[in-house]
Amino acid sequence: MKTLLLTLVVVTIICLDLGYTEMCNMCVRPYPFMSSCCPEGQDRCYKSYWVNENGKQKKYHGKYPVILERGCVTACTGPGSGSIYNLYTCCPTNRCGSSSTSG
């Protein structure tokens, strides 16, 4: 019984990873989405959008932002970084990267 309990505790700790590993949704244009652990040192998730000449996110059928890429980065350079037609936004949560327009 003690062995079983010890095994369950060890498996739980390994599976939970003690909450230190960031998981980011990865996107291969345009789909499928998959969650993947970020490499060591890259602890922020980001989303990359297409933007128009005014810096506004381009929408698909007027509803959803066109997300080009999602992944892990070492540090965020701040909202709105990237080129004139490509906007990078860091996400505030683990496994972020849904189709919502908020970071």
From Swiss-Prot:
Residues 1-21 form the signal peptide. Belongs to the three-finger toxin family. Ancestral subfamily. Orphan group XVII sub-subfamily. Keywords: Disulfide bond, G-protein coupled acetylcholine receptor impairing toxin, G-protein coupled receptor impairing toxin, Neurotoxin, Postsynaptic neurotoxin, Secreted, Signal, Toxin. The keyword Disulfide bond applies. It is found in: Secreted. InterPro entries: Snake_3FTx (IPR003571), Snake_toxin-like_sf (IPR045860). This is Muscarinic toxin BM14. Disulfide bonds join C24-C45, C27-C37, C38-C72, C76-C90, C91-C96. It comes from Bungarus multicinctus (Many-banded krait). Negative results: does not bind to receptor M1 (CHRM1). Is unable to compete with alpha-bungarotoxin for binding to nAchR at concentrations up to 100 uM. Does not manifest cytotoxicity toward myelogenous leukemia cells. Is not toxic to mice at doses up to 3 mg/kg. One of its GO terms (cellular component) is extracellular region. This toxin inhibits the binding of [3H]quinuclidinyl benzilate to the M2 muscarinic acetylcholine (mAchR) receptor subtype (CHRM2). GO terms for molecular function: toxin activity. The record marks K58, K59 as: Plays a crucial role in mAChR-binding activity. Expressed by the venom gland. CDD domains: TFP_snake_toxin.
